[in-house]
Amino acid sequence: YWEQVIKLNDYQKHRFAKKIINNLFNTVNGKKITFLGWAFKKDTNDTRESAAIYVADQLIEDGANIHIYDPKVTESKIKSDLTYLWELNGISENRILKKLTQVFVYDKAIDAFKDSHAIAVLTEWEEFKNYNWKNIYKEMYKPAFLFDGRNILCAEELREIGFEYYQIGKI
């Protein structure tokens, strides 16, 4: 039973990354994707088995630049999570160092949005609900994509602003 749960979780992470790639015209190569959240759940800095690690890995492999904001997870933790995954997958040290040049971490969310092609919500932090999404939209390339992996934002409001908004499990 648990093996099936793990397989389904892995499939969902893969599907989320694929949804981002497909909606950004089948490539994220050279594109800036902003991640909101890295921890596996809100109110913690625990990143064990966080979906963000696997989604980032897939997008980086496709050439994306990942810009990350999480209120509790440090840059060194984020980079060590990715390095650990890549080492497990047998990726060379040189290749890992190259991949890490595609990862950017911010202390303030507002700094992560400028010139983003897409935003992916990967942790359900309360603060994300209270952002000024109108201002964020103005900072982004158009069409501005928002992928809500936690279904915490108001779809109607975001679409009204102009976002191409996608929720997990919904169209």
Segments (PLM) and residue ranges:
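Structural/interface elements that position substrates and couple domains in central-metabolism enzymes
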Residues: 1-171
